[in-house]
């Protein structure tokens, strides 16, 4: 196996859909593994160490939301949910549990691959860059965030969101702009992705999430970085 190939873990109990996903992803150069049971997914993530997890919400053993919550307790692996159009409440629950993005069924293979690639993109040769918002320090190439020497553990997506705000401290970002810059969307998308991840980011970087100083809301517009 080419060790440079990125591995996708597909967690879905629909054999035909899992087979289709495997064919599409392997055709795009990814390695894939398939698990059909939610409770087995946790073991598979530990053993296979995938670069990304495609996670169906409706699973036997343990549902996708619970799988997501447990994974997020100790892993920053990117998670993209697969969900039916009727699952709007579950979409929010999934995002609040730690999913980075979601794809509605039925989806076009190109759309799915675009979402996967957006979450896997990483610039391997980033120049040295240090940013700060208040007393929060961001070492961009090291993907490290600290406050007074104490490291703050963020998922890759939360890190990307914080960096986007910190790089342009005077700019107010609309949710649509953040969806394009951080999630890689090229068309209007679900702004709940932004709202939920701002909440998750604040829970980690703010001293008092109810009175944010690092990620500020500009009412009626969007979000911006707090004062330096």
Curated annotation (Swiss-Prot):
Effect of residue 56 to A: Does not complement an lpqB disruption mutant, when overexpressed causes the same symptoms as an lpqB disruption (antibiotic sensitivity, defects in cell morphology and biofilm formation)
Residue stretches spanning the membrane: none
Molecular functions per Gene Ontology: phosphorelay response regulator activity; transcription cis-regulatory region binding
Keyword Glycoprotein on entry: no
Gene3D superfamilies assigned to the protein according to its UniProt record, in alphabetical order: 3.40.50.2300, 6.10.250.690, Winged helix-like DNA-binding domain superfamily/Winged helix DNA-binding domain
UniProt xrefs under SMART domains: REC, Trans_reg_C
Localization terms from the record: Cytoplasm
UniProt KW keywords: Cytoplasm, DNA-binding, Phosphoprotein, Transcription, Transcription regulation, Two-component regulatory system
GO terms under biological process: positive regulation of DNA-templated transcription
GO cellular component terms, A-Z: cytosol; protein-DNA complex
Domain Response regulatory intervals: 7-120
SUPFAM superfamilies associated with the record: CheY-like
Primary localization class, coarse: cytoplasm
Keyword Phosphoprotein (UniProt): yes
DNA-binding region listed in the record: 128-227
Post-translational modification (record): Phosphorylated by MtrB.
Highest taxon listed in the record's lineage: Bacteria
Residue numbers carrying 4-aspartylphosphate: 56
Reported function: Member of the two-component regulatory system MtrA/MtrB, responding to environmental signals. Controls expression of a number of genes including dnaA, ripA, fbpB and probably itself. Probably plays a role in cell division.
Summary of subunit composition and partner proteins: Probably a monomer when inactive, phosphorylation may permit it to oligomerize. The monomeric form does not seem to be phosphorylated.
Protein name per Swiss-Prot or TrEMBL: DNA-binding response regulator MtrA
Species assigned in the record: Mycolicibacterium smegmatis (strain ATCC 700084 / mc(2)155)
């Amino acid at each position: 196996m080419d060790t440079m190939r990125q591995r996708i873990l597909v967690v879905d109990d629909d054999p035909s859909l899992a087979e289709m996903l495997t064919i599409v992803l392997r055709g795009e150069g990814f390695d894939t593994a398939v698990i059909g049971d939610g409770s087995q997914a946790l073991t598979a993530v530990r053993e296979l160490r995938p670069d990304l997890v495609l996670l169906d919400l409706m699973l036997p053993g343990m549902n996708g939301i619970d799988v997501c919550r447990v994974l997020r307790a100790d892993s920053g692996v990117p998670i993209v949910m697969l969900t039916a159009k009727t699952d709007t409440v579950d979409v929010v629950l999934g995002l609040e549990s730690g999913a980075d993005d979601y794809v509605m069924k039925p989806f076009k293979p190109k759309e799915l691959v675009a979402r996967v690639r957006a979450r896997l993109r990483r610039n391997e040769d980033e120049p040295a860059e240090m940013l700060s918002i208040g007393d929060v320090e961001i070492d961009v190439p090291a993907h490290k965030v600290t406050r007074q020497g104490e490291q703050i553990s963020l998922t890759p997506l939360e890190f990307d969101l914080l960096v986007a705000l910190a790089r342009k401290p005077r700019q107010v970002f609309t949710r649509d702009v953040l969806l394009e810059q951080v999630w890689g969307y090229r068309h209007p998308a679900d702004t709940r992705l932004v709202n939920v991840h701002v909440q998750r980011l604040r829970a980690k970087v703010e001293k008092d999430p109810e009175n944010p100083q690092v990620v500020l809301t500009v009412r009626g517009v969007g979000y911006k970085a707090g004062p330096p």
